[in-house]
Amino acid sequence: MALKSPAFRKKFPLLVTGSLLAMQPLATQFVVAAEQYDCSVSASGAWNCAPKSNAAAVDLPPRPVHDTTSVSSNGTVTSQGTSSGEQSAGTQLVTEAKGKGLKSRSADYSHLDWVPREKLTAAQLAETGPYCSGAYVEPIRPGMDDKTPMKDAPMFVGAKASRYEQDAQVATLAGDVVMRQGSMQVQAQEAALHQAENRGELNGDVRLRDNGALIVGDKAELQLDTGEARVDNAEYVLHKSNIRGNALYAKRAENAIIRLKDGTYTTCEPNSNAWTLKGNNITLNPATGFGTATNVTLRVKDIPVLYTPYIYFPIDDRRQSGFLPPTIAAGGDNGFTLVTPYYFNLAPNYDATLYPRYMADRGLLMEGEFRYLTKGSEGQFGGAYLNDENDDRKQQSDYDKTRWMINWQHKGGLDTRWLTQVDYTDISDPYYFQDLETDQIGVKRTDFLNQQGSLTYRGDSFSAVLNAQAYKLATVANVTPYNRLPQLTLNGTLPYNPGGLKFDYQTEAVRFERDLRSGAFIDEDGNSETRLDNNISGLARANGDRLNLAPSVSLPMNWTYGFLTPKLKYVYTQYDLDLDSQGKNTLLAGEEYSSSQSRSVPIFSVDSGLYFDRNTNWFGKDYRQTLEPRLFYLYVPEKDQTDIPVFDTSESTFNYASLFRDNRFTGSDRIGDENKLSLGVTNRWIEDNGFERQRFSIGQALYFEDRKVQLPGVVFADRDDARSNVSPYALEYEYRFNRDWRFNSDFNWDPDSRSTRSGSAMFHYQPEDNPNKVVNLGYRYRNDQIRYDESTGRWVVGGGDYGTPGSPNYVKDYYKIQQHDFSVIWPIVPQWSLISRWQYDYNRERTIEAFGGFEYDNCCWKMRLVNRYWIDYDEFSQAAPQNEKGDRGIFLQIVLKGLGGVTGAKVDSFLDKGIQGYREREDQAF
């Protein structure tokens, strides 16, 4: 039972355990075991203690031997062995450990709460890295979760023996001394408590614990009323963060901040000094989750490799202002590159990051972003600026040495019905992303930069969207795209259903326009060529307004065994067009220009399907097997649409899903004529827990009429597939060996030509319980593309040639796809993994990308070394094939866990893009 002493409550809160007599009111010249007294508090608040009746029968414990400073019976301080300022003989200094834990304190590092892996519980193993030989486990102790402020918390004290000198007001404790106040606990072999100064002196195996932190030392001074402490020859541990280190002395402030003099910081195991930060002054703030250090050297195996006058680093996963890990690179067009990001934790709901990027060959690129989160919105602003000192592109068209980028991404809701969205990126010149990298979140390299803002209203049965969308070209190898300025859509369903009928409507009013570039393009060598926009001819040069109305009525009928949905749809489209003189003079065969065009097309369809299932057993496992046949009839009469330009329309890629669409074109500028009957069937194998083991679908369409409606310049009579009576067979297959193994395939076979139109097969393996293992094997083939050829200004069916035979930049089958892709990350021995990818183009007999290397991963650091070959794309010509060239590089990435990446951020980038499952592997890694 603990007794409370009111006399000392104000300055020295103290509770005495049943095994100790402390603050004895009578001056004694001898020490006795506390177990021999019965103590209680008198009415005046003083102690009332009397010897137990059987005291004489009990052997007293031996008097503790004081190795260093002790308090004598007359209150004087004596020294036995060494002076107070020196370490006792045989004590190892932390500076002699060279970044490792002190084995002299415990051979198994148990003094740092280190628990070997084989002794961890299942729950502790789940929180421990796969390559860690153990973990720091904070022992359960009384008061560890006590939230009482130090000034209000009583003190609990325990020891094997004690004495108290009343005149000097000093209590001496010896033998397994334990003092606890609030959440803080201090252990030592002996202690001297000075009541008048509220100060304690502790010696021998000192351990201070508080809020997931442990400090171990040889001796310590403790301020009893505030919890301030100084521990000499100290080692420390932050359990949850797996952080440890040492210092000549460690100070714990009243607010629990830890300050280290000539200290170290690492996440490595106690017996490892793979890397450490060593600084004159290190501060660790558990309240904020960050630390700082001055005059810092990064040491590898106790060898200094990097110096910085100041560093700011995380000690857990919370946000805080400060420098982020730098990135260092060399080579390429930018030369030596150094990025030193600085993070501003401005508020819980908004922050900012500055990315100064020094490039030896270009200068200083200043880039930054600001992120915000409100009750109804989220987003970010970003920008970058560089006065480019590299003049390689000074002769190229559209280049500007003053290079900049701005970006705004926003999603918000004014209330539950009104939504706003902004995605806007602009750059100074089309070569920006080819020459410069960006660290901004959500900004990616693409040929067309989106510049869009929209306002959406969601009603109970409809939605209305006001949209403005433009594109900025980030390439010179594409024609200028159309902008939607503005676009208004209204789509919904009428709220009543007479006789089960369903009335839907889709409406759109939009303005399409673009400013085509004229004149010549100058490449980096000063050579002149015609701009690609000059190849655009006829109605393709038109701007205009489009109004599209598409009401429909259907009768959905659903049963447990199937469904039947007849549907009638009517599409009316009105155009108001503008066409320049060049367009009028270059009309394609059959085209006629009229400023006003309209089109009306009825669409009739019947969609139906049945559902059969049965219980079955396959290789000893129970399944629910389904058979789902589907029949879809579509009739769309032919309407001449030759005089209508194509603003946002292309032909859909053929696959199993396209068999059941009511328009073979995407967009509203073409409504494909069709009289067809599509047949398909799907077979599934489903386990009792809902896991779909495999799925197989096959289908084909029967055509009763030719498909005469085509894209501009394409003649249906020249297309075998437009005159065929049947479509290709469309197959889809997926098999999951388990939740770790997956195989996907699609295959389209043309029975007329007896050839494959397109196909792919992909095998993916990544165990849920061990995501470090990744295997991908895939093959793709496609030769049925319908695309727009920028070099000729014409739509091309199949083949995929770039340009025309005889032209200077002609490349046969440039767009034809016939590739395999193999990638793997596989542990070969503990801590070592193989990393590899090989992507090969059979059509052009070239390797697109290949890399191979290894990864070493342990408890506190990771390294990757990768040799890579890839096809680089750097635009100096409008002809895309001419801008491709092979490149090679050896890439090194080093990650110090708990500190961040030292170098090699680009390795992470191309591994993420090239290996499916890599990001999941990293997200789940310890």
From Swiss-Prot:
InterPro entries tied to this protein = LipoPS_assembly_LptD, LptD, LptD_C, OstA-like_N
Swiss-Prot/TrEMBL keywords:
Cell outer membrane, Membrane, Signal
Ranges where the record places region Disordered: 55-91
Choose one Gene Ontology CC annotation of this protein and give it.
transporter complex
N-terminal signal peptide: 1-22
A biological process term (GO) from this entry: lipopolysaccharide transport
Q: From the Swiss-Prot or TrEMBL record, state where the protein is found.
A: Cell outer membrane
DNA-binding listed as a keyword: no
Q: Which Pfam families does the record cross-reference, listed alphabetically?
A: LptD, LptD_N
What job does this protein perform?
Together with LptE, is involved in the assembly of lipopolysaccharide (LPS) at the surface of the outer membrane.
Q: Which family does it belong to?
A: Belongs to the LptD family.
Q: What is this protein called?
A: LPS-assembly protein LptD
Gene name on record?
A: lptD
